[in-house]
Amino acid sequence: MGKKRAREEVKDVPPTDVNMMDEDGSDDEDFDMVNVDFEWFNFDPEVDFHGTKTLLRQLFDVDANLFNMSALADLVLSQPTIGSTIKVDGKANDAYALLTVLNTAVHQDKEPMKDIIKYLVEKAQTNSSLAPIADVLSSGKHVGLVFSERLINMPSELAPPLYSMLVDEVEAAVEDKEPYNFSHYLILSKTYQELESKLDVENQKRKKAKEEAGMYYFHMEDEVLHKHAVAHGNFNYTKEDELAADSKRAFQEMGVKAHGHMILIEASKFPGAVKSVNEYLSAAQ
């Protein structure tokens, strides 16, 4: 799966059988395993605009409306030899997952990137653990801003080949004198915590104040990437609203509150971090 693809001509990685959980059972604990053939593709502006925009909106969560997501999708699609999509049933369908990187310095004057950089600097300044990120982004260095997102319930085993191919593609781009010689990689991600629903508290007034909720990762690989990071941590979304968890949850007993998350890794350590992700998720299977 980690085979490097030719840059001049798209060479799709062979389809991979991965088990996914089907949660449409009649009981909360009734899961069926479904075999799915995933296919890896380069970005294609002819077919990938809507799927790319949808996943980018999901990555930015409630703050997506702060940015021109159409312009961001176009920017991603403008460099089809960098990054990958994962699809089912052929290239013409929307992506189930994507991973790519944009050069913050090269694109800093373009509408989506300048707004995103300002946003990330402001968020980094709200958490002392993220302070190095604000410094790096404000320095004008060539930072590789990584966008990694996949549909909920997509298996984490898909992450290693996405990252491995990105490392290969960036290496080839640098050899071709393209502007991908980064000082750092900044991975934009998300975490979440389970919160006792405010509706439940109101309907069950005898309950005591909720205990501190645990923090969880949408992407398992983030925990591994932390070990190679200069800085990592959470930030609150600008438009967050805990009541949103009540409107989205249906039959769940717990609401879910998402947080933005950033991971900063020096470029020289990024290949080693990707290798660790491969080893960790391979061992977890």
From Swiss-Prot:
UniProt cross-references to Pfam families, sorted A to Z: BCCIP
Region described as Disordered: spans on this chain: 1-25
Record bears the keyword Transport: yes
UniProt keyword annotations, A-Z: Cytoplasm, Nucleus, Protein transport, Transport
GO biological process entries: protein transport
Location of this chain's protein in the cell: Cytoplasm; Nucleus
A GO CC term attached to the entry: nucleus
Main subcellular location: cytoplasm
Annotated Basic and acidic residues bias: 1-14
Disulfide bridge partners, by residue number: none
Family assignment from sequence similarity: Belongs to the BCP1 family.
Functional summary from the UniProt entry: Involved in nuclear export, actin cytoskeleton organization and vesicular transport.
Protein name stated in the entry: Protein BCP1
